[in-house]
Amino acid sequence: MTVKRLLAVLVAVIIILAGCSNSKDNENSKQSSKSNNSDNPKTELKVSAAASLSDVSKALKKEFEKTHKNVNVTFNYGGSGALRQQIEKGAPTDVFMSANTKDVDMLKKHNQAHNTYKYAHNQLVLIGDKNSDQASVKDLKDNEKLAIGEVKTVPAGKYAKQYLDDQHLYSDVKDKIVYAKDVKQVLNYVEKGNAQMGFVYETDLYTNNERTDKVNEIKKADLKKPITYEAGATSDSKFAKEWMEFLKSKKAKDILKEYHFKV
């Protein structure tokens, strides 16, 4: 074999070996990356939140996760009373964000909530069909309905009943009332025409931070006491504590105000 041929063979062998080495290094790098990812999975932070928080909670999650890259905040929405009952029965939850103070206080009394904080206020409003000119629940006709949340499990339902009692209107409309599992269902009933009026929170009139044109706000239903939202940690997770601290921050308060809550 000539010297030139020998050199050509040696060069070819070197190139092949180098290619194999690079391929192996790349494979090892991929395996290492996969291993690192699997070694550091995101921690789930489970938050049970009142249905009226379904929009703003997503904005709060986005802001919180900016500084907690290894946390995935998930939400379970419903009426505050129903959520509290789930927690009492052992449902896995790290934070409870209620639309009242009563349900948080009940958990706190039984050592099922701690680090509590009153983080927002809201306004009850009476809504009706977008084309309606009715001004009060007294204007409801015999076959028309008034939707409110379940009084025992939905704070907005309790507030609505309280308002009707305070205004001496309950006896006039009690036979027209249809009950809903949460305020979002009340809104849906009025939007779809299943009820001609309903009581919801002012914040429920906004979707994706835009005011709905599907219903008409008839009037604000002022109560003797303000509607106060309270939250509490329901597990010993360090991220539950950090979420509670986050709710006290200026950033969280600015987000709540942006979504029409009062802080």
Identify the residue ranges that each predicted region occupies.
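Central regulatory/effector-binding core of bacterial HTH transcription factors
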Residues: 70-87
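C-terminal motif of bacterial Sec signal peptides marking the signal peptidase cleavage site
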Residues: 15-19
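Short, high-confidence coil segments that cap the C-terminus of an alpha-helix
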Residues: 70, 92-93, 195
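Bacterial N-terminal signal peptides that target proteins for export
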Residues: 1-7
